[in-house]
Amino acid sequence: MMTYIVFILSTVFVVSFVSFSSKPSPIYGGFGLIVAGGTGCGIVLNFGGSFLGLMVFLIYLGGMLVVFGYTTAMATEPYPEAWTSNKAVLAMFITGVLAELLTACYILKEDEVEVVFKFNGAGDWVIYDTGDSGFFSEEAMGIAALYSYGTWLVVVTGWSLLIGVLVIMEVTRGN
């Protein structure tokens, strides 16, 4: 059951990015990013990263939602274009969705799904020692992995958010 939930969330995630990349109006582009952020957090939550999912949800959808609202207010159109108003955009959107479905069907045809990477050094994880036995805390492992193995991910995420804010400020600055 969890595999199907992750599959559905992944499909919604990719379709929302397809809708963002073929945005005819800033309103729908911001909506596509908001849906992508929410479903991405749902995927992270399904894999047990409740702290990371909550952190991304609060930072991304809390902070960037203000920027999306501001840019939408600055770039409102009396008659915004929808995906169906331009036939080329609609055709590209449908082509992207069909490509995603065909790729998903091809992947699901295989019998097993393999993990892309493996962690071999269990000594790097945070272990809580309670006398005779120790146990791993999922939250502490996630934070430790984020800042030890995923240092580049934190740097790229911070840099992307900074560049995104600067681009949005430049676009909405006007003449």
UniProtKB/Swiss-Prot annotation:
Core subunit of the mitochondrial membrane respiratory chain NADH dehydrogenase (Complex I) which catalyzes electron transfer from NADH through the respiratory chain, using ubiquinone as an electron acceptor. Essential for the catalytic activity and assembly of complex I. Its main location: mitochondrion. GO terms for biological process: mitochondrial electron transport, NADH to ubiquinone; mitochondrial respiratory chain complex I assembly. It is a multi-pass membrane protein. It comes from Felis catus. Core subunit of respiratory chain NADH dehydrogenase (Complex I) which is composed of 45 different subunits. InterPro entries: ComplexI_Subunit6 (IPR050269), NADH_UbQ/plastoQ_OxRdtase_su6 (IPR001457), Nuo/plastoQ_OxRdtase_6_NuoJ (IPR042106). Belongs to the complex I subunit 6 family. GO terms for cellular component: mitochondrial inner membrane; mitochondrion. The chain crosses the membrane at residues 1-21, 25-45, 47-67, 88-108, 149-169. One of its GO terms (molecular function) is NADH dehydrogenase (ubiquinone) activity. It is found in: Mitochondrion inner membrane. Pfam families: Oxidored_q3. This is NADH-ubiquinone oxidoreductase chain 6. It catalyses: a ubiquinone + NADH + 5 H(+)(in) = a ubiquinol + NAD(+) + 4 H(+)(out). Keywords: Electron transport, Membrane, Mitochondrion, Mitochondrion inner membrane, NAD, Respiratory chain, Translocase, Transmembrane, Transmembrane helix, Transport, Ubiquinone. Its EC number is 7.1.1.2.
